[in-house]
Amino acid sequence: MSNKIAILLAVLVAVVACAEAQANQRHRLVRPSPSFSPRPRYAVGQRIVGGFEIDVSDAPYQVSLQYNKRHNCGGSVLSSKWVLTAAHCTAGASPSSLTVRLGTSRHASGGTVVRVARVVQHPKYDSSSIDFDYSLLELEDELTFSDSVQPVGLPKQDETVKDGTMTTVSGWGNTQSAAESNAVLRAANVPTVNQKECNKAYSEFGGVTDRMLCAGYQQGGKDACQGDSGGPLVADGKLVGVVSWGYGCAQAGYPGVYSRVAVVRDWVRENSGV
């Protein structure tokens, strides 16, 4: 009898351990992810949910960052030679495998395709917390500006964004968490969220850091998603955030989390000259 009890206890412990491991895995999977990651380890990403189609001339700074010629993430034109995206979009990828397509409303056709010559990932990027989620891309060829290709404005170092500021996020990511990437560029208007409120919302996932900015509606419904990662969050013509991570997509009570651009303005200038 004692042997049977011991066996049952061992089985129970194994079942509990397995359940805890699965729960922990689910928590890891809420982090944002590219639509096609060169190093897929967890879900880390964002897509446009509850938004509307736009022409690229409405967001001429928008680029599609492509891994082996397939849409992977978004990005923003900073100058004729530099693009800003998320570090989790470039981690583990060689520059030779990356290109950007820009000047088109479709990520798979039109516009111009330019090779990436160099990736400058932020030295403090933390893949577990998605902190310092920034990468600069130096392009092989200089861009020619037009109505459909323009650099985005940048904030000053440590410039703040007031709570409730209306912002616009754009990209080709999913319109549903399990859907395919959008063929046509989309955007959504979302207000910024108080930092303490956002930190509380994500407390079970470790909270948010000072490098992070949150935007979205309490009731959900509008957000970025897988495939939008690395893309722009713009307010008054300035790039205030980079699509980074979140719990699901457009989930009530969980705003989208973006990498705050103002805190690395000097780093951008030092490494790109922009």
Curated annotation (Swiss-Prot):
Q: In which tissues is it expressed?
A: Constitutively expressed at low level in the gut of adult females. Also expressed in the gut of male and female pupae.
Q: Which N-terminal residues, if any, form the signal peptide?
A: 1-18
Tell me the GO molecular function terms. Answer: serine-type endopeptidase activity
Which residue positions are annotated as catalytic? H88, D133, S229
> Which EC number(s) are documented for this chain?
3.4.21.4
Q: Which cysteines are joined by disulfide bonds?
A: C73-C89, C198-C214, C225-C249
Class of the enzyme per the UniProt entry, highest EC level: hydrolase
Q: Which domain of life is it from?
A: Eukaryota
Its family remark reads:
Belongs to the peptidase S1 family.
How is this protein induced? By blood meal.
Q: Which UniProt keywords apply?
A: Digestion, Disulfide bond, Hydrolase, Protease, Secreted, Serine protease, Signal, Zymogen
Gene Ontology annotations of biological process type: digestion; proteolysis
Q: What is this protein called?
A: Trypsin-1
Hey, where's the site called Required for specificity on this chain?
A: D223
Q: Peptidase S1 domain spans which residues?
A: 48-273
Q: Show the GO cellular component annotation of the record.
A: extracellular region
Protein localization: Secreted
Which Gene3D superfamilies does the entry link to?
Trypsin-like serine proteases
The record describes the protein's role as: Major function may be to aid in digestion of the blood meal.
* Subcellular location, principal: secreted
Q: State which residues form the propeptide.
A: 19-47
So what does this thing catalyse? Preferential cleavage: Arg-|-Xaa, Lys-|-Xaa
